[in-house]
Structures are given as structure tokens and as C-alpha cells.
Amino acid sequence: MAKGSKGLRASSKAVDPTLDALFASSAGPVQAPAKSKYSTLLDQKVREPAKPKVHLEEDDEVLSEISEELSFEEDGPSDEDEDEDEDEENSEQEDGSGDEQEEEESEDVDETMKDAPVELDDIIDATEDKSNKERKRKRKNDNDDLEGKYLDKVAAEEEADRAGKRQKNDALTKTEKPAVDEEDAGNESDIPVHETLVKDSKASDLDKAARTVFLANVSTEAISSKSAKKTLMAHLSSVLEKDATPPQTIESLRFRSVAFAGGSLPKRAAYITKSLMDSTTKSANAYVVYSTTAAARTAATKLNGTQVLDRHLRVDSVAHPSPTDHRRCVFVGNLGFVDDETVLNTNAEGDTTEKKKNKTPSDIEEGLWRTFSTQGKVENVRVVRDSKTRVGKGFAYVQFYDANDVEAALLLDGKKFPPMLPRKLRVTRAKDPRKTALAQERARGKHISTNGPKSTKYKHKATPEEQSMAGRTSKLLGRSAAVQQRHKKRPSAHGESREAEGQPAGIKGPEQFVFEGRRASARDGLPKDLKQKKGKGKKSGRPQNHGTKRASEWKKKKN
């Protein structure tokens, strides 16, 4: 053993003393780092603080592009990561085998020095790749399902809007039917409906007209005062039956023919501001719509001539108005144009003076009601006014229920009844409108041509012979005669027709009369038994014909 040990150990003389001093102070051969030292570095991950999530409100196209890029990045590194994991496992296995070899083979110093740096570089590369992978995965987590989050946010906002609309429409949905979508409504309108089920607008208008009542001489206080309007409504509903089925009520009340003060102001604005012109007239017209036709008929019969707000009401049905009978009417003229006839005079200096014709303003319509009611029961009073300004035209018509009351009303002619009727009345019988129309046509006929359609001059009536010849003249007398008879033109000697001369075609002049019989002569006055001596008349010459002319010419040539 001692000999063997001596043989293996180098002699002290063979070792260089300088090298011995160098290696004596060194730490020894380079050893591979332990596995546990780098495994701790791999396990420790650098955790960056999480970035705040930002809700990007971008278009759907931008979001889809981002999602495609993210998916592309996820697909790319995944294969590389798998390869890196395999490399790490292989490197770990190699490290384990390397440690065992280092313990067993400590003598191979050069090989370990070559292998150690290679293994260290692989481990460093693996840690860098893993850190990059973790960063990519963090980016992926931050932008994960970005488009879905955006759509969820939009859906939440729409749901909030719908909830707000539902809260607003809760009150309406309780009383009304649920709203129908536009598409459903359009589909329903396209569905054909039988003509018997379709509501006719004309029929509805006729039904409403049957339930409407016309009111005249309504006080304008009902327009300007709410209490006066309530009084009028109570009076109009006083004749309705409370226990009727269906119930009888007043649906609407509309005022018409109102004299407004503002000339340039629209009628609706003037009605809202209650700017009325009482100086023109204190009355207006109105229309009342009842719920049933029976209620309208009852109101028209019972309320006519009644008093409300110190005025007599004229009530008439719109669908079936009362007839106008001239035998029961009187014409009243010389009435005032406006109720308040105050005259304003302005001097040259600009001073304005008022001159009132009457201390108390007149009231024409109500005055006629009260004045003629003393002579009989008045059915209606119609004062003719201008449709726009409501200024009267100075006359009116008063109709009674009984025609005998007209005689008593005629006694009021030439009388005045202040303060409502301050002027003297001109009362006459009302004329038949048909006779008046005929008289107007006659007056117009004077200015119309003789053969005009409304001419009042004599027109020839065709005789039976002419009637029998009608239609056969062209066959019997020729086409020209038929044309003359059709146009009733008889040419005169001068070539002008009788119509052009101003005489009707059916009347003949004195020169056109022809009496049948022989022509009159001087012998008509002599007695028949008287014989007169016949004197020799002049001898008639030879006939002058073609033969005599030739003979005379031949004789002249011969001589």
C-alpha cells in the first residue's frame, strides 16, 4: 500500500512553487450552481400593479379588430411556451444528471467548466421567456371579452331608458289600451274589412247633426263670465230626463257669430282674452250637442222662447229646422245698425267729442222679442247681420205661431219703443219669397236678349201641324227648309231675318198677310146688272219669238 501511494503522489520537486502558491489561495475548481438556487428565482414572479379598467366606447369594428389581434397573440406564443416548457424540463433533467456526475466525477474539471455557462444561459433565457409570457397573459386578461363588456353596457343603458318610459306611461296604461306596434298597426290597416263594418263618416256627421241644437240671442255674458255660463248650462239641461236610458247629458257648447273687439287679433285669441264688442251687439249664436237625439228634440220644443240671463232664447234643431212661413211673418225695417250709436267728432285741434243719440244703448234683437210678444206668441226673431263684423243691416223678420197675430203686429207700424227700439218701426207683411224671386227675374229679363233662356217676351207656341212636321221636314221639304225650321229663321226680302229686325219669328208683319179670293178691281163697286160698253183695246202685235226675229233680219238683208 505504501508503495502504491508513493507512486501515485507527485514529488515536491516536480511542482512549480509559483503555481503552488497560486492554487493554494484559490477557492478550488468551479462548481455548477445548485438547482434550488435558481428554482426560487423561477418561482418568484414579478407582479405589476393592475391597470385600471377603462371602458372604451368605440365602434364594433374597432373592438372586433382588437379581439382578433389578441387571439392572434395568444395563438402564437402558446406553441413557443410549450417548447420552452419542454426545454426547461430537459434542462432540469440534465441539471440533475450533471450534479450526480459532478459528485462522482470531480476529476473532470475542464468538462464542467465548459458545461456550466451553457446551462446558466439556458436558465436565464427560460426566466425571461416566462416573464414575457406572463406579461402577454396579463394583457390578454385586461382586454379579455372587451366587445362583450361594451355590449352589456349598451344593453344596460337601453334597459334603464325603457324602465323610465314605463314609469311615465303607468298612468296611461291603466286607463287606455296597450299601445300597438307600428308594424302591427300597419298589418291591421291592410286587412280588408267588410263595408257593413266600416264606420261611415257621413253617417256619424248626420248623427251628430241630429243631436245638435242651434241657439240664437245668447247673452255674451256667457262668454266672458264663468258663472253666467254655468247658469246657461243649467238652463239647457233643465229639460233633460234624469232617469232616461241612456243618460241624457250635454256633450259640448260652442259659441259662434261673436262680435270681437280686436280687429287684427285672431278670433281664437280674442275669445281667450274675452275682448268682446258689446257696442255692436250683446247677443251671439251657439250650438249645443246633446248625448241623444231625443234630448235634442225635447230641448228644441221646450226651450224655444224661454228667458235666461235676461234674454229670450231662440232654440231650433239643426237636422230638422222649423219651416219659414211668410203668412205668419212680418217685416220690420228702420232698425239701428249697432246697439250703441255714439258718434265721435274730432275737431281740427284734435279734440274728440262724444255725441250720444240715446242715453241708454239700444238692444234690437231683445227689443223685438219683448215688443212683439205683446201682440202674440213669437216663434222666432231673425235679425239680418254681416257675417264678419256682426253689424246689422237695418231690418229683421218676426214670425208668430198664429197667422192671426200678424194683423195685430201691423198696428205697430210707425211707432217707437225706447230705449231698446228708439227708431220708428216700419212693419209690413212679409212677402212670399217665390214671388219676390219671380219679380227679380222679370227685372233682370229686361236686360237679357229677346231669345234668351229667361226672356219674358212673347214666345211662339208650335201648332199641331208644326209638331207633326217636326223631324220629317228634311224628308218632305228638303234639308234647307229643315234647317230654317230648326233655327226658326225666316229670311226676309232684304236677306235679313225677322229676329235681326227685332220682331219675333212667330209674328208676321202686315205686308205678309195674304187673303184668299180674287184680286179687287174697279168693277167691284158697280151693280151686277149694269152693262158697260166694252172699248176696243189695243191690238196685240205679233208674237215676238225666235222665228219672227229671224224673219225680220232676213227682210232687212234682202232690202
UniProtKB/Swiss-Prot annotation:
Keyword Coiled coil: no
Span of domain RRM: 211-320, 328-432
UniProtKB keywords: Nucleus, Repeat, Ribosome biogenesis, RNA-binding, rRNA processing
Biased composition (Acidic residues): 57-110
Alphabetized InterPro entries for the sequence: Nucleotide-bd_a/b_plait_sf (IPR012677), RBD_domain_sf (IPR035979), RRM_dom (IPR000504)
PANTHER family found in the cross-reference section: EUKARYOTIC TRANSLATION INITIATION FACTOR 4B/4H, RNA-BINDING PROTEIN 34
Family per record: Belongs to the RRM RBM34 family.
Main function: Involved in pre-25S rRNA processing.
Protein name per UniProt: Nucleolar protein 12
Originating organism: Gibberella zeae (strain ATCC MYA-4620 / CBS 123657 / FGSC 9075 / NRRL 31084 / PH-1) (Wheat head blight fungus)
